Amino acid sequence: MPRIQVLPPGLVNQIAAGEVVERPASVVKELVENALDAGATSVSIDVEEGGLALVRVADDGCGMSADDAQLALERHATSKLRDAEGLAAIATMGFRGEALPAIASVARFRLDTAPAEDGAGTRVEVEGGGRPSSGPVARPRGTTIEVRDLFFNTPARRKFMRAAATESGHVTEAVVRLALARPDVGFTLRSAGRLVLGSRAGAAAADRAAQALGRDAHRHLVPVDAGRGNVRVRGLVCSPDHSEATGRALYLFVNGRYVRDRGAAHAVLRAFAGTLPPGRHPAGVLFVELPLDRVDVNVHPQKLEVRFAEAREVYDALFHAIAGTLRTAPWLAHGRAGGSAPPGPVALTPPGGAGSDETAAVLAWAREAHAPEGSGALVPPPSPVPGASGTFAFAIPDEAGLARPAGYFASLRYVGQHARTYLLCEAQGGTLVVIDQHASHERLLFQRLREVFRTRKLPVQPFLLPQVVTLPPAVARALEGGLPELARLGFDVEPFGGDSFAVKGAPAALAGVDLEALLLDLSAQLELVGSGTAVDEALHDLLATMACHAAVRANQEVAPEEARALLDGLDAIDFKARCPHGRPVVFELPLAELERRVGRR
C-alpha cells in the first residue's frame, strides 16, 4: 500500500479549483465578488468563447500594493478575515483566500493593480500554477485580472465544458445575479466584443429586475417590504399573470449574497399557492436581511448555500411577507365595499342537490364566515421603500388603472349566462366582463372557509370510537410537536404509543376525509418548516378541494338572482382574481377592443 504523503502546492490548488472553479461563470463570479469587496463602483467583464479563451474583469476599487498583489496568490491569504470570531459574522462576499490561487492553477493568469492614481502599479503573472513573476506596470487605481485558456493544463476538466454559447449563458446569469445584488455599482458585460449587458450605477431596482426577468415583467412588479422577528424581507415580485415554467426566475439573496435555498424557495411558492396554475412558478427578486451571526455562509465551496441559525424564522418571514403583498397588491385585490356588512352566502346548489355531508358542512361554515370589514377606501399599493444604505430603491411602473374600484362586481349589470359556464356582465363604459361561474364560486367559498380556520378555534366533533393512525418515525415526531396547532384547528389527537396517535375528534366539515392521509400531509409540512404557523397553509389543498366540490359546476344553470348574489359575494372578499387552483376568475373585453375586432374602429 502506498505511503501517505503531503501533496505538492500546485496539485493542492488544482484540487481546490475543482471545488471553486466549476466553469468560466465561476471565475467571473469570484473575480467580480473580489472587485465588490474592494469597493468598486464600476465593473467591466469581457469574455471570449464563453470564458474558456478569456475572462477579463476590470474594476475601479481600492487596488493592491506590490506586496499584497503577490500575497493574494497564496492559498488562504486574505484581507477579509482575521480570526474565528470574524468567521461567525462574514460581511464580505469572499473570505477564504482560495479563489485566486485556484484559478491561477488551471489557467494563464495575469493581475494588474494599483492602489493610487499616481500610475504606479504592479503586474503579477502565473501560468498553470507555476512560479509567479511580477513587475511594475503603469495603470490607474483599481485592478484588472485576465484569465486565459481556462483548464488548458487539465484536459479532463476541459472536455466536460459545454459549447461556447452555453458557457456564455452561464456567465451572463452570474453577472445578472451580482448586478441585482448591487444596484449601486455599474456593470458591463461583453462577449467577443459585443455588449451583452450594461447597467449603470444607481439604476432603479425595477429596471435591473426587468433585465433579469424580461422586459414584460416590468409592468407586473410590485414591491415587498416586511419584517418578522430578526428577519426583514425586501424586493420585488411579479403578479401571477407573469409566471415561469421553472423556479429559475426567483432570485433569492441573503445579506446581499445570491443563494439557493429550498426552504426559502418553498416559502415563496407556498405564499403563491392558489394564485398560480399547476406547474407554474413565481418570479421575483427578494432580499432577506438578518444579523450576520444568524447565518453561516461557510458551508458550500462556491458559497451558493447557507445555513440559518433558525430556518423557521426565515421561512415564516418570507411566507408572511409575500402573502401580505398578495393580499394588498392592486393587481390582486380588486377592492371591496367599505364599511358595509358583507352580503349573505351565495345560494348556489352544487350538482346533485344538497350533496354529501362534507359539502353540507362546508356550506354551513361558509354561511357563518365573515370577510374582514372594509376600511372605507381601496387598499393602497405598498409604498416605495428606500433601499438599505440608499442602494436599492423600489421604484415601480405606474399602476393606475390596475386596481378595480370598491364594489366593482356589485356595479356590474348582469346580462346572462353563456354555455352554462360563464356569467356575462357589462361594466361602465360598455366593457364586457366574463366570469367563470365555477372558479368564482370556488374562490368565494374557499376564502370564507379559510377565514374561519384562521380566526377561530374550531369546535371538535367527537368520534364514537377513536381512530388510530400510525406514521413514519420522523413524521410522527413532527406531528407530536404540532399538536397544539392541530387542537386550534379542531383536532383532538393524542399520542398512542410509539409512532401511533389516537384521533378522538375532528372538525365537522372534515366528515368523510381520509384522516391518516390528512395528518400525514400536515406532519410533512411541520417536518419541512418546523413551524406551527404553516399548518393553516398546509390545509390549502384540502380547503380548495372542499370548496371545489361545493361550488357550482360548469355546464350548470345559474338563475339571475344566484348570479347576482355571487357578484355581490365577490366584493366581500379581499381576493378574487383566481380560483384556489390558480385559474383566472374574470376576463374583460373593453368596448374599444370589441369594436376594433368587428371593424367599427
Swiss-Prot record:
Record keyword DNA repair present: yes
Matches recorded under PROSITE patterns: DNA_MISMATCH_REPAIR_1
Region (Disordered): 119-140
A molecular function (GO) term: ATP binding
Keyword vocabulary terms for this entry: DNA damage, DNA repair
The UniProt record lists the keyword DNA repair: yes
CDD domains documented for this protein: HATPase_MutL-MLH-PMS-like, MutL_Trans
Membrane-spanning intervals of the chain: none
Gene Ontology, cellular component aspect: mismatch repair complex
InterPro entries the UniProt entry points to: DNA_mismatch_repair_CS, DNA_mismatch_repair_MutL, DNA_mismatch_S5_2-like, HATPase_C_sf, MutL/Mlh/PMS, MutL/Mlh/Pms-like, MutL_C, MutL_C_dimsub
Pfam families: DNA_mis_repair (PF01119), HATPase_c_3 (PF13589), MutL_C (PF08676)
GO biological process: mismatch repair
Coiled coil regions in record: none
Purpose: This protein is involved in the repair of mismatches in DNA. It is required for dam-dependent methyl-directed DNA mismatch repair. May act as a 'molecular matchmaker', a protein that promotes the formation of a stable complex between two or more DNA-binding proteins in an ATP-dependent manner without itself being part of a final effector complex.
Family: Belongs to the DNA mismatch repair MutL/HexB family.
Descriptive protein name: DNA mismatch repair protein MutL
